[in-house]
């Protein structure tokens, strides 16, 4: 971001506001007797500490322990407490990013540009959200801006490309002032380049979980019209929800019934996460358990509205969540929850079109991933039904080095999830176009290898979590595990998920992939295999220069025992072409498309060829 340095300096000073009314901490009722254990946990009801409980006794008393600490990570990113396995490679980075501590140099160039990682599966720590809630200077700045020109727009203009009209100019001027309030732009009386306004708008959208091409669409205009304290409160509820999901071992979010609930009468996610998939609600679908549990936790802590939440942080003094675990009463978990659950997965490919993109028809039924659990009564419950992706036409280098289009298919049939890889690395196949492996430094204007794409990290082509699709075949010497390169994995290419296309893999929103992995490790027997320390270097040539992409390790592996059964259904093949096209075809002439303009200014997403695994790259060294 152009104002990244100023932004980080401003944020670093905000937690001091938490000390404003620290003297009121004595008003919190204290129990007469502390339980006999070394680390008793505070029990909260209706915003008041009503007692303390030993962690071991909490389940007996119907209480759930929720870790609100600033060094929290999801279950999938934790390692066993032993001296055998190396630490998870991405854990410390995750904690720093959640606290908006962005690395210096090239390592931090991507997160500094993204500014807010809420949209990409790394929810801010409570310290960060509390500082936002208590930032009265920012709230007052927003309230003083007349944003009526934004709300009266008849179109959804994009700052970097929009045709200049009086209405658009007035709207962009108001937007500029609001983004200065957000400290995403420096205050300036000079005329600002429109690409800077574009970058700042995209960062604002990421902050509020808005999936957009960086345009002033209706959803963004609604957010800009909202009170900033309300938006910060929704961010607080999203962070709390992640902690509740982890603490209670939940995943059931209502998607199997096509109904996501609200929390304190609020829809706290962007519209894209409530979009329909064209499928009917499932009779065997689990109800939304996540939203009621999150609301129960919020009410227990007294976080019922922005003012009440702000008062909580003021009352508890500076850095209240540096180390904080609380005990609250949540709705009971379903009876089918267990340490080892009988689970299976079904991936419905939905409507499949093999025609070239320009000739493809409408996708009415989008691909979905459904996780089932078998109950003690031998019935099945659909826990979630999430949007995912299947194959499509993607760019690839042909045999003579020319760029063309090839259809990347998603395998159909029964597979197994055995290997669950956290913070995975992506190994570029030989046919990956070089342009997909570089990005341009905005400051220096030079091309450098895109190490973020390889991982580990939220911007990896595989996201934060990957599950390998294996086909097990029994041979004379035991089981042979065939890997055709298909994975279920996280991604920050959210537009591809909404448009249902990938390079053959089944993509999930980054935060959903983390939830899935954490649920599997919580409710499925597994072995911790640990760090996959197999270094690799990918060499390629870009514009006459030889470049190297080092891959120091390939992720942190867990082995599910037994593996989870996965069935990929064929879906419904539409159009005249009924079989998978095998040949590579010439690139069609470029056509104007809304996403083309956005791609010029949006942060780089996992590029073309990100899942091609037809031939493993040659090892170096």
Write out the residue ranges for each language-model feature.
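N-terminal pre-domains immediately preceding structured catalytic cores
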Residues: 2-621
């Amino acid at each position: 971001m152009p104002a990244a340095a100023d932004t980080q300096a401003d944020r670093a000073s905000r937690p001091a506001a938490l000390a404003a009314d620290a003297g009121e901490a004595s008003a919190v009722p204290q129990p007469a007797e502390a339980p006999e254990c070394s680390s008793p946990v505070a029990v909260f009801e209706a915003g008041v500490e009503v007692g303390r409980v030993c962690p071991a006794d909490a389940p007996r008393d119907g209480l759930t322990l929720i870790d609100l600490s600033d060094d929290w990570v999801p279950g999938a990113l934790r390692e066993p407490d032993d001296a055998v396995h190396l630490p998870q490679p991405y854990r410390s980075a995750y904690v720093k990013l959640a606290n908006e501590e962005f690395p210096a140099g090239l390592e931090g160039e991507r997160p500094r540009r993204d500014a807010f990682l809420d949209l990409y599966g790394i929810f801010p720590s409570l310290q960060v959200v509390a500082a936002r809630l208590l930032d009265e200077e920012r709230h007052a700045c927003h309230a003083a801006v007349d944003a009526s020109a934004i709300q009266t727009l008849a179109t959804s203009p994009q700052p970097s490309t929009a045709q200049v009209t009086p209405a658009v100019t007035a709207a962009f001027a108001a937007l500029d002032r609001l983004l200065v309030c957000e400290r995403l732009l420096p205050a300036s009386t000079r005329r600002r380049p429109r690409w800077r306004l574009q970058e700042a708008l995209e960062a604002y959208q990421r902050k509020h979980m808005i999936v957009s091409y960086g345009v002033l669409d209706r959803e963004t205009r609604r957010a800009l019209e909202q009170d900033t304290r309300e938006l910060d409160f929704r961010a607080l509820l999203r962070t709390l929800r992640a902690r509740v999901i982890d603490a209670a071992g939940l995943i059931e979010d209502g998607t199997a019934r096509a109904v996501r609930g609200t929390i304190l009468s609020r829809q706290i996610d962007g519209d894209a996460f409530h979009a329909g998939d064209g499928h009917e609600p499932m009779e065997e679908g689990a109800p939304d358990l996540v939203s009621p549990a999150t609301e129960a936790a919020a009410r227990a802590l007294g976080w019922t509205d922005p003012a009440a939440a702000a008062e909580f942080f003021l009352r508890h003094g500076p850095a209240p969540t540096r180390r904080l675990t609380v005990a609250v009463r949540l709705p009971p978990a379903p009876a089918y929850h267990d340490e080892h659950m009988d689970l299976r997965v079904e991936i419905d490919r939905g409507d499949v079109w093999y025609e070239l993109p320009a000739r493809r028809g409408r996708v009415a039924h989008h691909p979905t991933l459904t996780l089932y659990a078998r109950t003690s009564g031998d019935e099945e419950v659909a826990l979630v039904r999430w949007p995912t992706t299947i194959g499509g036409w993607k760019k690839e280098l042909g045999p003579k080095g020319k760029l063309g289009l090839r259809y990347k298919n998603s395998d159909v049939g029964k597979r197994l999830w055995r290997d669950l890889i956290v913070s995975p690395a992506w190994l570029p196949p030989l046919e990956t176009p070089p342009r997909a492996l570089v990005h341009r430094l905005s400051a220096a204007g030079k091309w450098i290898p895109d190490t973020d794409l390889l991982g580990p990290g939220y911007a990896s082509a595989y996201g934060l979590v990957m599950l390998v699709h294996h086909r097990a075949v029994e041979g004379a010497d035991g089981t042979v595990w065939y890997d055709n390169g298909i994975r279920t994995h996280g991604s920050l290419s959210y537009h591809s998920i909404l448009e249902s296309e990938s390079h053959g893999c089944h993509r999930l929103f980054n935060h959903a992939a983390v939830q899935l992995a954490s649920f599997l490790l919580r409710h499925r027997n597994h072995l911790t295999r640990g760090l996959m320390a197999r270094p690799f270097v990918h060499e390629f040539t870009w514009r006459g220069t030889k470049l190297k992409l080092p891959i120091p390790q390939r992720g942190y592996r867990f082995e599910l025992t037994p593996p989870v059964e996965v069935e990929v259904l064929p879906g419904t093949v539409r159009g005249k072409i009924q079989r998978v096209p095998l040949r590579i075809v010439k690139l069609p002439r470029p056509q104007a498309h809304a996403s083309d303009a956005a791609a010029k200014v949006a942060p780089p997403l996992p590029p073309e060829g990100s899942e091609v695994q037809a031939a493993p790259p040659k090892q170096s060294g």
